């Protein structure tokens, strides 16, 4: 090897190692960003069971917006994902009552602080219940929601474990986030209401 060839070869090795280093940095940054986004902003969740039918179906996957825990506020009617007793169990329900509110159900009508609240997302379920000659939601309450807690129910009121039975009132720190979008199955992608 001549002296003229030697520097070119060293430059080539140096260029290759720089290229590998640049690619490595880009991959590390991309993975770190993906982990941060998943932990703090958005995460996919699987719907298990029929408690939110017909709004959500068993086996659907939805994106959960976790940013409501840091900025914004959870609103009545939002679909929320709730941590269960173990890290592998999550519940998907609809937020009905907020801290300080009084929740009551009479004759299939929701009342918050004595004021009638429309629930348009229940229209098809109420129609089916009426055909069967039953109320979709049994009467209950009034229930005063304490500070730091939320009252939730599934849309499939005849088949839902929620704040009325089993789950109880939900502590604010158990709410993972809200969902506004189903992304799987792909042929049925949609916003949730």
From Swiss-Prot:
GO cellular component: plasma membrane
Similarity annotation: Belongs to the peptidase S26 family.
Any one GO molecular function term: serine-type endopeptidase activity
InterPro entries listed in its UniProt record: LexA/Signal_pep-like_sf, Pept_S26A_signal_pept_1, Pept_S26A_signal_pept_1_CS, Pept_S26A_signal_pept_1_Lys-AS, Pept_S26A_signal_pept_1_Ser-AS, Peptidase_S26
Highest taxon of the lineage: Bacteria
Protein name from the UniProt record: Signal peptidase I
Pfam families given in the database record: Peptidase_S26
Regions that span the bilayer: 26-42
Lineage: Bacteria, Bacillati, Bacillota, Bacilli, Bacillales
Membrane-topology descriptor: Single-pass type II membrane protein
Enzyme class: hydrolase
UniProtKB keywords: Cell membrane, Hydrolase, Membrane, Protease, Transmembrane, Transmembrane helix
Positions on the Extracellular side per record topology: 43-193
Organism: Bacillus amyloliquefaciens (Bacillus velezensis)
Localization per record: Cell membrane
Gene3D superfamilies cross-referenced by the UniProt entry: Umud Fragment, subunit A (2.10.109.10)
Catalytic activity: Cleavage of hydrophobic, N-terminal signal or leader sequences from secreted and periplasmic proteins
Annotated active site: 51, 93
EC number, UniProt record: 3.4.21.89
Keyword Nucleotidyltransferase found: no
GO biological process terms, semicolon-separated: signal peptide processing
């Amino acid at each position: 090897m001549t002296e003229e060839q030697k520097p070119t070869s060293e430059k080539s090795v140096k260029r290759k190692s720089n290229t590998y280093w640049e690619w490595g940095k880009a991959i590390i940054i991309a993975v770190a960003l993906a982990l941060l986004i998943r932990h703090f902003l958005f995460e996919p969740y699987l719907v298990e069971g029929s408690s939110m039918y017909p709004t959500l179906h068993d086996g659907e996957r939805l994106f959960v917006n976790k940013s409501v825990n840091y900025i914004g506020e959870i609103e009545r009617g939002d679909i929320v994902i709730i941590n269960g007793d173990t890290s592998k169990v999550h519940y998907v329900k609809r937020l009905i009552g907020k801290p300080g509110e009084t929740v009551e159900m009479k004759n299939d009508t929701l009342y918050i602080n004595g004021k009638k609240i429309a629930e348009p997302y229940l229209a098809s379920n109420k129609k089916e219940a009426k055909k069967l000659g039953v109320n979709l939601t049994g009467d209950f309450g009034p229930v005063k929601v304490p500070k730091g807690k939320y009252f939730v129910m599934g849309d499939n009121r005849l088949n839902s474990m929620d704040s009325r039975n089993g789950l109880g009132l939900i502590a604010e720190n158990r709410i993972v986030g809200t969902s506004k979008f189903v992304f799987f199955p792909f042929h049925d992608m949609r916003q949730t209401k």
